[in-house]
From Swiss-Prot:
This is Thymidylate kinase. It comes from Baumannia cicadellinicola subsp. Homalodisca coagulata. NCBIfam families: DTMP_kinase. GO terms for cellular component: cytosol. The keyword Protease does not apply.
Amino acid sequence: MKSKFIVIEGLEGAGKTSVIQQIITILHSNGIHNIISTRDPGGTPLAETIRDIIKKGMNGEYITDYTELLLLYAARTQLVAQVIKPALMSGTWVISDRYDLSSQAYQGGGRGIDIRLLQNLRDAALGKFYPDLTIYLDLPPSKCRARIRARGIPLDRIEMESLSFFQRTSIRYRELVANDSRIITIDAQQSIAELNATIRNNIERWLKSQQK
């Protein structure tokens, strides 16, 4: 089977990291071992530096919404060019913690940036390069915030946003995933056992569909 690009999406605290590890295990059990995982923003030295600015700020300087948006796309285009596309061309599967859907939801919903502008920027920066599969972990913003705060570590610049910010982001996520057949929505409120079973069933069903 040709190498694939899989993305895990969701709000902070939705459980993306655990699901990525589970998907890697599922792929291994299906004979797929040549896999790398990455994150967006991040994944290259330059993109990781940009990630730090987005997450931590820059010596207290105010970061405008459009500056944040352009930083995200700078990091993303670097990740695609330096990591994702070369890996896929070499036969390696790629699993990413976030990709472009995050900007469409966070910047379009949370920040309120014009949706058409975001779509045009996406097309200009990434062309027609889309994930083969996106898993969206749907969890209410209030529960995501509770999980984040339960970690007991300082919140980053994004995690400190208001509940209404994450509610707007969640609404936009749901609008986006409802119109794309390449995205599978998973109810992340399930128990760990139920969530694991749902992930496995969906991934294995998708793998079978790719073999046709």
